[in-house]
Amino acid sequence: NGKTYTMTQHGFARDMEFTLDSQTQDTLWFSIVSNETTMENYPFTFRLEVGYQLKGTEVTVLWNVINTDTKEMYFSIGAHPAFFASMTLEDGPDTDHIHVGDNIEGTFTCYRVTENAMALEDDTLVLPRDLPLTADLFSRDAIISKDDQASRLALAYPDGQEYVVMQFDEPIFGLWSPTSDAPFVCLEPWHGRCDADDFTGTLQERAYERMLEVGGVFNGVYTIGLPLE
């Protein structure tokens, strides 16, 4: 509509209070809907439903994004779950690893980011799929994958035994920890990401932005498993 809107880091949904819609022994569904406050930062009416389904040692997270507006709706959605993990100063026999993909041989490609968390699309980085969790890994902030590099991420002990496994259908993912001594690392499946450092376009032109027709519903899912339990 030609108007400029501002938004906080990671969007507004995480700052809203969700309503519990339904609850069973193994499933919870929550929701939020657009209101006057969201319209100040995001010019669409919508409903967002988030479900959690527990089965054994796995939890599946489901997203339903519903366009309740009278026009096409553009959006991004992603997750930011954190898991306890320890980092070492350098790669060694006591170093945990991140496994990227089903086959951890080879490499994957990701974007570097600027100090203000913008993607440098002309400055990519190639990293091993068996990625040591060392103190300098996030010295340049988050690691942001390029398209369809993996649909599975895992945290593994030094002997290679995985203790957290995430499977997802999102096209890109992020890896992040705030400091070298933080006791956790985030595995983040995304539909959408930060803008490129030189991006000046519209919402419709953003990389990885999703579009919903009037009345349309978008479904997303990811699963977290604890294979050692």
What kind of region is each of these model predictions?
Residues 4-56:
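Extended, loop-rich substrate-binding clefts of extracytoplasmic carbohydrate-active enzymes
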Residues 63-69, 177-178:
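Asparagine-centered strand-capping/turn motif at beta-strand->loop junctions
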